[in-house]
Structure formats: structure tokens, C-alpha cells
Amino acid sequence: MSDKNLKEIISELLRLGYEGTYWDFKEDYTDCREDKLIDIICMANNIDGHQAYLIYGADDNGNVKGIEKTKYSRYTTKSVTEFLRSKPFAGDYIPKATVQTLEIENHELDIVIIKNTNNTPYYLTEAYSPSHDVKKKLYAGAIYT
């Protein structure tokens, strides 16, 4: 997909002003690894069977805020891939994701693109809870959407 096509797709999703089954707006990154993982799994398992987008730098209504001043480490394709590969996914099938940065409304947005594959649903074979917060724990065998 060319940057222009991606920019058109993301601009249209932002204009809608709401989140959907295959796109989610994130105003900023988080350091909570459970939140990072569940966001990617949910998008990878979207019920539309569509390529999915985590759009960092926009609020829940699609208003562009920018991600350039985040205090957190920004995602790269390498960092997302390494993060996912280190998790206990069933069948060793991991979501396929890439990261691209776009400039929209004079701000940078980081877009995590989660590819649509035939390997869904993605789920873990072991519980995942590095923060030890029971409210954030991802459970083995659970299908998150």
C-alpha cells in the first residue's frame, strides 16, 4: 500500500469521528504491556476480517492531536514484531503488523497496520500479566475482539 493510499484511508477514518471494529484511535502510547498486546490482538481478530489500524495521535473522536511529543517510546515495525514474537501465541501464529508514520493536519500520527490473515483467531497459550494487575491480565485460550 502506498503512503498516499494509507493517508487517504486514515484521513477518512478520522473524518468519521468514531472508532470501529477494525480501527482504534489512541491519543498517546502507554507503558502497560497488557494494553499494548490486547489492542493488537483485538484488531487482528476484528469481526470484519479487515486489515486493521491502531492510530496513535488521535483522540477517541478522531481529532488529530499528534504523537510527536509523546513521552513514551514510539513503535517501529521492528519493536512491534519483536514484542509480538516474544508472546505465547497458539500455533506460533503471531499477528503481522507494520508501523508507518503519516503527517496529517501538521502532526505526526503513528499507524500500526495489522494485516488480515487466515490465522485468526489469535490467542495466547499461557496467561500474560507482567504488571500482575488482575484487571489487565490476558488469559490463555481467551479470544479477544
Describe the function of each predicted region:
Residues 1-145:
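Conserved N-terminal catalytic/coupling substructures associated with nucleotide/phosphate chemistry
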